[in-house]
Amino acid sequence: MIVQLTGTLVSVTPSVAVLDVNGVGYELGISASTAAALPQAGEAGVTVLTRMVVREDSMELFGFASREERALFDRLRAISGV
């Protein structure tokens, strides 16, 4: 499981960040609060906590600015139907 990534922030929108880690671009689904906490695009050495979600038909990577936000995400995912 990928639990964090460190690299250069390529772009940030209110819902998606792209982080370049040694030439590989990772698209991360993020919340508005994480987007607000991230530095401007182009910043190097940015660490983002992550959670990978693997489903039957997709693999998604989500990014978080704090451990608390990631823990809340984990608790929400544990609820059936969410």
Task: Report residues per predicted region.
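Extended, charged alpha/beta regions that create polyanion-binding interfaces
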Residues: 1
